[in-house]
Amino acid sequence: MKIGLIGLGRMGYNLALNARDHGHEVVVFNRTLEKVKEAEKQGMIGAYSLEELVLKLEGRRVIWLMVPAGNSVDEMISKLVPLLNKHDIIIDGGNS
């Protein structure tokens, strides 16, 4: 399965590694683009914009948000929704 993951902090990066280690293709985006480059070195698929992340996912998209809870999540969802289709899935994995 190919999944999208936004947020490559400690939790997001380790979740991406775990998914990769279990056979999933992981498309990653982070506002700090250097973290995307590092993830690419670990075999993940880098995306340098939200639009690029969405385009790299096929079929029913699954996008996991690993950004801090609160306004960051709300802002990210408001940017993502116009790019997605009706049956795409957003998972909020952020915590406070």
Which stretches of residues belong to each language-model region?
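Beta-loop-alpha module in the N-terminal Rossmann-like domain of NAD(P)-dependent dehydrogenases
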Residues: 66-79
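NAD(P)+-binding Rossmann beta1-loop-alpha1 motif at the extreme N-terminus of oxidoreductases
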Residues: 1-65, 83-88, 93-94
